[in-house]
């Protein structure tokens, strides 16, 4: 806990288990780990496996190259890197994932989570699925406008710069950070509780 999976570990698991879909968290909230994703998409393509990424804590704040890294499906939220109120879950899937979805032999048992229905709702069929939260659409538009005005790479750099200042400050106080710098999230910092501090008492307080 507190370490990223290596490329070799992921490659071995995909090649031996042969999953239909490989899912991984890009930015792990509980541990503060940033998982490298480059190269995983190639392994998935070679093994006829879809590549799904949980980008809840990374979208908008960290480099996330959906097409370049050959990510087939990804989802996130509105309230973290996009700086909006909670309530929306941005989602993307490519043609490869759509083809897999449309070739299902069994019906999705859950109506609300049936992506084929969502596809028809957002696509040209316009089949009703749910009432969209219009106020949230305005909110996410504003969040995206602010990111676009600053520049996406500038946002990434700002998070990195501020994180390093925080890390240096914590270490100057004698605190030990939980994750090695190579795999440390710039958007979420985890700190080890010093031996002299009662961890349970601190959390309860």
Predicted regions: what is each one?
Residues 176-205:
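Conserved PLP-binding catalytic core of the aspartate aminotransferase-like
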Residues 67-79:
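Conserved active-site segment immediately N-terminal to the catalytic lysine
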Residues 59-69:
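Glycine-rich, charge-decorated loop segments at or immediately adjacent to ligand/cofactor-binding or catalytic sites
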Residues 2-58, 73, 81:
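Active-site phosphate-binding strand-loop segment of PLP-dependent enzymes
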Residues 73, 88-92, 188-190:
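Conserved hydrophobic/aromatic beta-strand scaffold that supports enzyme active sites
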Residues 79-168, 172:
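Active-site C-terminal subdomain of aminotransferase-like
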């Amino acid at each position: 806990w507190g370490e990223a999976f290596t490329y070799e570990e992921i490659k071995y698991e995909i090649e031996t288990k042969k999953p239909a879909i490989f899912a991984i968290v890009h930015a792990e909230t509980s541990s503060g780990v940033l998982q490298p994703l480059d190269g995983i998409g190639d392994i998935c393509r070679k093994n006829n496996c879809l590549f799904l990424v949980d980008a809840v804590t990374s979208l908008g704040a960290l480099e996330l190259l959906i097409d370049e890294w050959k990510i087939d499906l990804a989802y996130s939220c509105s309230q973290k890197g996009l700086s909006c109120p909670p309530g929306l879950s941005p989602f993307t899937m490519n043609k490869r994932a759509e083809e897999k979805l449309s070739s299902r032999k069994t019906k999705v048992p859950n109506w609300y989570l049936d992506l084929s229905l969502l596809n028809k709702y957002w696509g040209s069929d316009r089949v009703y699925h749910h009432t969209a939260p219009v106020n949230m659409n305005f909110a996410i538009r504003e969040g995206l406008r602010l990111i676009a005005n600053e520049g996406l790479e500038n946002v990434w750099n700002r998070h990195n710069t501020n994180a390093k200042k925080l890390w240096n400050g914590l270490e100057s106080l004698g605190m030990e950070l939980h994750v090695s710098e190579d795999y440390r999230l710039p958007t979420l910092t985890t700190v080890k509780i010093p031996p002299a501090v009662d961890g349970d008492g601190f959390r309860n307080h």
